[in-house]
Design a protein with these regions (language model features):
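Short beta-strand elements at the ligand-binding edges of bilobed clamshell
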Residues: 110-112, 168-191, 205-206, 237, ...
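Short, solvent-exposed amphipathic alpha-helices that sit
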Residues: 88-102, 106, 184-191, 213-232, ...
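Extracytoplasmic "Venus flytrap"
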Residues: 75-103, 108-126, 130-132, 138-142, ...
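Hydrophobic alpha-helical segments within soluble ligand-binding/sensing domains
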Residues: 70-73, 77, 120, 176-202, ...
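Flexible loop/hinge segments that line or gate small-molecule binding clefts
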Residues: 145-183, 202, 208, 301-307
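Hinge/cleft segment of the Venus flytrap/periplasmic-binding protein
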Residues: 64-66, 73-75, 206, 210-214, ...
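Bacterial lipoprotein signal-peptidase II cleavage site
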Residues: 18-33
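Hydrophobic alpha-helical
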Residues: 128-129, 133, 137-154, 222, ...
Length: 374
């Protein structure tokens, strides 16, 4: 069993499938209060798949995952991946390649869709044509899925939506595995309110890719809390496409328009934060715990946490890319004809720079960084 996966905390949702015979009758499971909060927040978010989840804390569980294919026959899985825009994405891809390996009894058809919706639809149609056994999709955007999902269903191929969410009715896919990005946005804003303790915030937001549920969720969650703070002002919010180059470009243009007017930069992933830091450095703007500008980031990848440990990023909200083991567990249950969870949330936490203590986040240490493999 994969060690990393053992450390995942899952919230398993009740969400019974409308499809006869699909879904689990098990109680939802959670290990921490934070995980229960995650579920409750998801239930508030209309655009998200976990809206079906029921917040009920119960038994403890860890992700029993990456156990390998026990059916005795090779299982052919297609994975339509978003692209390779970020360190998070690279880690997610590697995790799928490790879990769905030939040694584990799988044949993985992996397509890097390079953030192109049309390419992603084409990839899924290719999987249908090849009559693969299971299709996994990390959807670039929330919209536009109904037709192709209907095609997969007509072909009798089970579909698992992973990482991000879609707008389609949940009768059109079989399971969903991912993180609650709205809750990540709420955590970031709650931490900021705690840190500022009533002081003014003039905020610039570097959003992720347009139309991605990770962008929509983080924005919605952050804005919901921001709306309760009359002392906060969001000066501007632009997409940096989840890339370092995008983050740098947006930050350079923000500096031109708002130099001297902002004290908070929210980057919706670590790579954007790296680009934003480069742009601020070049403009002699100081940031981090000893600087003039507070930086908030998302993902908490190894390098992002290194910057957090160094005090350059004040707060980094985790998003766990290690999800393939959970997807494999669902596929193994489907193959065995057993019950499985229709919706599985992979839990996230948040980290803050040394010297900061928070009710919403863990203070970074060398040990935490040493334990972060991706
Ligand atoms: O935060 C970002 C990636 O969908 C949660 O996509 C994922 C996001 C992640 O490119 O780095």
């Amino acid at each position: 069993m994969n060690k990393k996966l053992l450390s995942l905390v899952l919230v398993a949702a009740l969400a019974m499938s409308l499809l006869a015979g699909c879904g689990s009758k098990e109680e939802p499971k959670t290990t921490t209060a934070a995980a229960a909060d995650t579920t409750a927040a998801a239930a508030d978010n209309e655009t998200e798949a976990p809206a079906d989840t029921t917040a009920a804390a119960g038994d403890e569980t860890t992700a029993a995952a990456a156990g390998g294919n026990t059916t005795g026959e090779t299982i052919r899985v297609g994975y339509a991946q978003v692209g390779h825009e970020s360190d998070w994405r690279t880690a997610n891809t590697k995790n799928y390649q490790d879990v769905f390996s030939a040694d584990n009894g799988y044949e993985l058809s992996f397509v890097d869709c390079d953030n192109d919706n049309a390419a992603q639809l084409e990839a899924v149609r290719g999987f249908i044509q090849q009559e693969l056994d299971y299709i996994v999709i990390a959807p670039i955007e929330t919209a536009g899925w109904d037709t192709v999902l209907q095609e997969a269903q007509d072909a009798g191929i089970p579909v698992i939506i992973a990482d991000r969410e879609i707008d389609a009715p949940d009768t059109l896919y079989d399971a969903w595995v991912g993180t609650n990005t709205k809750n990540e946005g709420i955590t970031a804003a709650n931490w900021l309110a705690e840190y500022l303790d009533g002081k003014e915030a003039n905020i610039l937001v570097i959003e992720g890719s347009v139309g991605a549920s990770a962008t929509l969720g983080r924005t919605e969650g952050f804005n919901e809390v921001a709306a309760e703070h009359s002392e906060w002002k969001i000066l501007d919010s632009q997409s940096g496409d989840f890339t370092q180059a995008g983050g740098q470009e947006v930050m350079e243009s923000f500096i031109k328009s708002y130099e001297g007017q902002f004290n908070v930069v929210v980057c919706q992933n670590d790579n954007e934060a790296y680009g934003a830091m480069d742009a601020m450095k070049a403009a002699n703007i100081t940031y981090g715990v000893d600087g003039d500008v507070i930086i908030i980031s998302f993902d908490a990848t190894h390098d992002g946490l290194q910057y957090t440990l160094d005090g350059a990023i004040n707060c980094n909200v985790e998003c766990n890319p290690i999800q393939a083991g959970v997807v494999e567990e669902v596929i193994q249950a489907m193959a065995a004809g057993s019950d499985y969870e229709k919706t599985t949330l992979v839990n996230d936490e948040a980290f803050v720079a040394p010297g900061i203590t928070s009710e919403y986040a863990t203070t970074m240490t060398e040990d935490i960084l040493a334990g972060r493999a991706y």
